[in-house]
């Protein structure tokens, strides 16, 4: 329990880190298409765009064996690596510290803090994400009563990268990780929906304007994940993507005309 962990404690910690389980999950997702050139531009190599420029905006809440209860929101984009189709985590927001730290340190998810809520009343489902008083995106859907079959297995891609201690460049090449999810869906409802994306200096979601809404999905499920490092990208090549996943530090000068909080909400 102290600052120096025993071998027994380390084993328990690593077992939890290596085998995350998320139970009683509830999630609203809106699938939509963007321009192919837009999707290709935001994908870091070695990820490749898929034939369908699919983006998924989602809001949900979860219980877990490793980071407690939390709610969150995310933007995933379709991508492929060596022929394995998955979803690249472009942006992801959590309402608690533990899932943020876990996602960043272990998996490489670009997690930031935000307020996220999911609402369901009958066939109507909605979700929203807000950060520092500014809306990030909102989802609204009406379920048709049609039930689908959720994927028993799915994949997400992330990059682990570290800013150099000097402030210039990265400490080493970025690592591409792949998480394999084993899903057990109890509810997988299909419907129609809409998504509203709000851009800002730190969260440029306006780059993902939908050209076609595919469908809305409301799901309830349990899932477990295993993550592995599958590739690397040269630090200089990944640097623009690395900083694109963060807030813009150059806009957070206390001596500027706006305070840091005002910069985040402008």
What kind of feature is each model-predicted range?
Residues 47:
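Acidic/histidine-enriched active-site and ligand-binding environments that engage anionic O-linkages
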